[in-house]
């Protein structure tokens, strides 16, 4: 898949405008995140690591917008996504995987809403790899940028489908953090295909 950086920059600009003008969610570039993380959210705002390349920022912004939508529609999903779960049982892991999938389905809808349909495959590939990394992390606590036997044992790569975005009024969590989106970008990739 050969996509120019200019395309990611253009798409990111459109997503940021949609976030501000349609969803009324503020996206803030910041260097004030724990180094272990590259993004955070509170339901009304998204903080994104300012050092990210546009491609990585685009994925993380649309992913976090998806979670922001979830948080504003469901207190249960807000509670689920507000903590990093360590070694969840299989039932909770499945809920977490479905939560991640749904966020990316909202992200796909956002891309389509701004007229971008040529990044569907790219988004699916980013989501698929993210699911492998997250699944390994959830089950082991190990931050590893790899497709492992553990992540394959709990494989979850449903195809992304547009999910309509209901109207909502964004509201923020009362507590603050310094990161929730795990940064796998600076790790050596192993076993990726």
Predicted regions span which residues?
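Pan-zinc metallopeptidase signature
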Residues: 86-88, 116-193
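Basic/hydrophobic alpha-helical interface regions
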Residues: 5-25
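Subset of outer-membrane beta-barrel
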Residues: 27-31
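Short pre-active-site segment immediately N-terminal to the catalytic Zn-binding motif
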Residues: 45-61
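Short glycine/serine- and small hydrophobic-enriched flexible loop segments
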Residues: 108-112
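Post-HEXXH active-site segment of zinc metalloproteases
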Residues: 71-101, 105
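Active-site recognition of the HExxH zinc-binding catalytic motif
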Residues: 59-75
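Short, exposed beta-strand/loop patches in secreted or surface proteins that constitute
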Residues: 34-41
């Amino acid at each position: 898949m050969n996509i120019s950086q200019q395309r990611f920059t253009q798409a990111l600009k459109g997503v940021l405008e949609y976030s501000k003008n349609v969803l009324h969610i503020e996206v803030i570039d910041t260097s004030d995140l724990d180094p272990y993380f590259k993004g955070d959210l509170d339901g009304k705002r998204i903080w994104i690591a300012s050092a990210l390349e546009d491609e990585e920022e685009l994925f993380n912004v649309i992913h976090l917008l998806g979670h922001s939508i979830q948080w504003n529609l469901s207190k249960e999903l807000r509670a689920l996504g507000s903590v990093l779960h360590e070694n969840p049982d299989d039932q909770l892991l499945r809920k977490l995987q479905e939560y991640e999938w749904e966020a990316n389905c909202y992200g796909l809808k956002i891309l389509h809403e701004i007229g971008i349909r040529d990044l569907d495959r790219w988004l699916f590939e980013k989501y698929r790899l993210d699911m492998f990394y997250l699944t390994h992390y959830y089950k082991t606590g190990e931050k590893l940028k790899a497709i492992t036997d553990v992540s394959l044992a709990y494989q979850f790569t449903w195809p992304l489908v547009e999910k309509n975005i209901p109207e909502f009024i964004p509201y923020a969590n009362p507590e603050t953090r310094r990161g929730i989106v795990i940064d796998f970008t600076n790790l050596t990739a192993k076993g990726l295909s």
